Amino acid sequence: MICDRFRWVFCQLEVLRHCFPSNLRRILEELPKSLDDTYKRILREINNANHVYAYRLLQCLVVAHRPLRVEELAEMLAFDLSPGGVPKLNADWRWENQEEAVLSACSSLVSVIIERGSRIVQFSHFSVKEFLISDRLARCMEESQFYIIVEHSHTILAQACLGVLLSVDNCTDQPSSRKLPLYEYATEYWVQHIQIGNVELVIKDTLDRFFDTDQLHFSSWLRREYPYDFSTDSEDEDTDMLPSTATLYFAALLGFHGLVERLVVKQPQQVHLLGGHCGTPLHASVYGGHIEVAQLLLAHGADINSRSALDLTPLHITSEMGYLKIVKWLLNNGANVNSQDVRGHVPLHFSVSAGHLDVCRMLLKHGAGVNTRGNTGSTPFLEAWKSGHTDMICLLLEHNPDVTSGKT
């Protein structure tokens, strides 16, 4: 409350600082009586012609996963994000003076600071963001056009990110920040924006286009972000194109339920094939922690005990990741609790090594072998002993481990 009062005083002083002496008395009489009223006044003074641009910039500032540089935020003004269409970046719409464009559109609601050599756009005060997403603004008759719905804002930024990535089709060269200012942000955060609420459903057409295997957009991003998943040694394949199994695999890994559903209907055989580093699409979905996607894949015939190139099953992966809910679901649907990988390790080895006590308890409840030896003779109990995890050791001692097993 005290902080809000200081902010209110600051805003009033800013108004008075720019007024002529002859207007001082009138301005004093018209000053807003609260911080909310101050922000309403600022919103009303935003030029009607600039409303759509100001609103878009404010939306991005509300939901951005990191502070945006001036050139990144200004790039949002160059996008055609018409409903129902694929986002298009128009270079002719870019402003020459990007900082002026941002500040003139958003007025005193935002400011620019210098941080580590970059010019960063931020809200002038934390209360600005709070007000823009508040029910108080939503109930206003005139100013409610600036009320920001968070999920819709994620949709806007997701569309822009995909618009940037759709403009890139070179698999080796990363675009310069001068050519595509938003590329760095888009590459890192597009997935997080799509995973919010119903954003994936809203931008379905754009997402389908990005994942189109006949295009190079998705493969261009993928080969930069997941280079270990693909070999370019084959002389029989076009190295710019992805393996046919990669699309479903990565849709599952990223948790795109709607896209996975469309893909398995279109190519049901892909459910069973290795698509990347983790293994099958089912491996990928549980690695990403996406139980709904895993359930969808199982409903379309995925093998719950399918194996990766290293003989890992989905249960091995979830046991190491510590996803108790998914571990329980896999076990209840027939996952082999004592399946061994190429090293002879069972899921219990993985959960013990990772220190996931609750997962270990669940595996033991379903018959996990506490004395199962790996190829080197190591048992889950010896793994716990090496780690010094006291609670884990006590849990395993309840199941009569062979404390002498293993190679010495």
Q: Language-model features: where?
A:
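Polar/charged low-complexity regions in secreted precursors and cytosolic/nuclear IDRs
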Residues: 278, 289-292, 301, 308, ...
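Ankyrin repeat domain, specifically the short helix-to-loop turn at the C-terminus of the second helix
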Residues: 262-270, 295-303, 328-335, 361-368, ...
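Tandem repeat protein-protein interaction scaffolds
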Residues: 312, 317-321, 329-332, 336-345, ...
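Ankyrin repeat A-helix N-terminal signature
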Residues: 250-255, 284-290, 317-323, 350-356, ...
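Ankyrin-repeat boundary/"N-cap" motif
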Residues: 240-248, 273-281, 307-313, 340-346, ...
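Leucine/isoleucine-rich amphipathic helices and adjacent mixed helix/strand linkers
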Residues: 2-273, 280, 284-295, 299
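Conserved ankyrin/ankyrin-like repeat signature
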Residues: 259, 292-293, 325-326, 358-359, ...
